[in-house]
Every structure is written in structure tokens, then in C-alpha cells.
Amino acid sequence: KVYFAGKSEHYHIPLGHDFPGYGLIEWAKALGIPNATHNNTRGYITRLLERRLIAAANGLDPDDPAVDQVLVAREPGVLSCVINLETGSLAVEAALKMMLSRFYEIDGKAVPYAGRIPVFLVIADNAGGLTGNYHGTTVVAQTLRGLWPDFTEKAEGAGLYKVVSVPINDEAAFREAIRTWNQAPYKTAGFCHEIILMNYGGIRLTPEYLRAAYQACRDSDTPVLCDEIQSCAWYDGLFLFRKYGLTPDFVSAGKGFGGGCYPASRILASGAFDSLTQFGALVTNGQEELASLAYLITMAFIQANGEHIEAVGRAFHRGAAELTARHPAVCAGVEGDAHMTALRFLSVEDAAAFCAAMNRRCVDISAQTYKPNCPPVALTKLPLITTETMVGRLLALFDEELTALEGAKEAKV
């Protein structure tokens, strides 16, 4: 049987399994290029990748002389630095450390907000709790989404830091949170967000909401982390924040860029907040040369096929929206965007039954049912090599199973 990787093996293979382009990695090995480098240096390939990531993050061609000016910039909202790590959790943790370093000394240097209590703003769930966000598996990142509640309570009680959730797509509530938590003894340490909440129903934050939030953050000296671990390498231009016209201070990148070949995440940062010393940011395997080559291969493919990627993504999301509208007995619409589209169901049972049926038909998608306040959805993340013909076939299979699901429900009435 032929299986369709409808979630790209949890976002790792934008170009599918065994993409021929990654054969260049074997050629590099044959030429004697090693993967490992000394852990406080970077090889030529990694340095080249850093330049190209910064260029892409700023909407520039890597050969544009303007990239050299960006690399020395130290302004909020201008991404000019790359810290090479290994996993997305470490990338996000680096951003959190840089946010906290404005409140607590790392190496004896004075900090701008000494004595204030740092407050992290994160996206709320539909009940106002913390489970709407997901920023990795380190301890502090897990407290942002409601894990370690006793630990978090003690940290807050001791005045170490506080976590506050902000409602989804509510501009007024965000501005009020900024106003409230910038009064002594508190100070907003940062706003952490994804653009598409793939761990919470595939809900998409709107461009209007995010632009308003970014402006409120800029006005209050609050750095912004745009967590693109799951959305990077899935859009023309490589980063979804570019399509929104956003200017984050930190961007996490990983998963898709490595094409499933190597774990190799990075944090892109504004030089204005790059406060970690060399050994405060170092990860032994972060600078691997062949991992960087995998990034460059993925980026070259996406940049050469941007129009196709955009067209297929639009066709899939539009087709999914039309499809759910034809099945109102079980569907409530769509969430997400382009290849990262989620079908929203009226019940958890329907979402689970639909995904089970699609799995039997050799399509790998899954129902998100493990969070009590999360909308029941079937999540997809199609590989970028998906064609419009494949989208048509996939939607036809969806239609058949939704029709069968509606029929089964009617038979029970």
C-alpha cells in the first residue's frame, strides 16, 4: 500500500521521505566534509546558512549588500543574529533566557529592569487558561502552558516571574494586558506566540490582531517571540511572519528546514536583545555542517518553487472550506492556513471517527482531542511536494468519509 504523509511526519519532512536533493549530503560526505565542528566555532556551511536565514527573515536576497548592514544592526524588530542550537525547545529557551536577562544579572552586568517582576504574555485557551500555547519542553516553557502548577505558583509567590494568558485575537484585551502588567512592581518580559496554533485546534491568529499586539509591545519595550518551529519552511518566503508583515524580536526555526535529516533548530534574534555570552548560548551539536547543508537544500527548493507552493496551499485550504460547508451535520468549518489546514468538527467523536477512517484509507492525519477546551479538529500538514492533483484526490477522500459519517449519524436518529 502507498501511504500519504498527511502530517509530514509531525512537520519534519516538507519534501517527503528520501527527497533526492538531500543526496547532496552524501556527496558532501564523500568530499570529506564532516558534520561535527568544534563547539565554539562554526564552519563555512553554517556561516553561509546564517547569512541566508537572516536575509530571508528580512526579505532580502542573500547577495544583497544590505544584508551586511542588517548583520550589524542592533535595533528591536530587526533580526540580525543566529544562535545555532539543536531542538526547538532549546531555541525557545534561548529566547526566554534573553528576555529574563533584562531582569536578572547573568555575568554581573547591570540590567535595565532590576527589581521588577517579569511577566510573560502567552496565548490563552478558550477558557482563559494557559493551554492554548506550546513553546517546547524545558521547565520554564512548560510553565507557560500550565504544566508544573505548584512550581509556577511558588515562582510567582517569590516574585521570580509570572505567566499571564491573553485571549485569542482580542486586540483590546491585549492592550489592557500590556497596560496592567507594565505597572510596578511588574514589567512585561515578552510576548510569546505561534501564528497557527497547531497544538490548539489549528486556530490562526489574524494579521490585524498580531500587528496591534506588536505595536503595543514595541510601545512598552516588550520583546516578541514568534515561534515558527512548526510553520517555518512551509510557505513561500520561508517564514509565515514575513507574509503577515510582522517584525518580531525572536524567531525560532527548525523542524521542516532540516528535512528530517538532522535535528537542527536555531533562534533568530534582534541584536538589541542578544545578551547571552558564548557559553551561555552554546550547544555542543548546534553547529553541525551537514545539518546546515540540509537547511540550505530545503531553502533552495522552497525558494525555487514558491509560486507552486502558494497555489497548492490556497487550493487545499479553499477546497477544505468548501467541503466542510457541504457537511454541516458534522463539520463547523476550517482553521489554519494553506498546507497547515485543520477541519473543525462539531464533536470530538466525529473528529476521531473521521481520522480513523482516513487512516484506514492510508492517509496519515490525526484528531486533536487531548485538551478539554480545544476545538475538535482533524489536523493536516501536507508536504510541499503535494500537487494540485493530489489535493483533489485527498479532498475527494475527505468528502467520501464525511458523507459516510453523516450517513451513520442519520441512521442512528
Regions found by a protein language model. Give the residues of each.
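Conserved PLP phosphate-binding loop immediately N-terminal to the Schiff-base lysine helix
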Residues: 194-207, 222-244
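Active-site PLP attachment segment
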Residues: 245-276, 287-294
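Structural motif of enzymes handling amino- and sulfur-group chemistry
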Residues: 285-308, 312
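Conserved PLP-binding catalytic core of the aspartate aminotransferase-like
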Residues: 313-317, 327-359, 376, 384-388
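PLP-dependent enzyme catalytic core of the Aspartate aminotransferase-like
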Residues: 302-305, 376-413
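Active-site core of PLP-dependent enzymes with the aminotransferase class I/II
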Residues: 176, 196-220, 280, 383
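PLP-dependent aspartate aminotransferase-fold enzymes
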Residues: 12-15, 22, 52-193, 207-208
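Glycine-rich phosphate-binding segment of PLP-dependent enzymes
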Residues: 3, 7-63, 80-82, 297
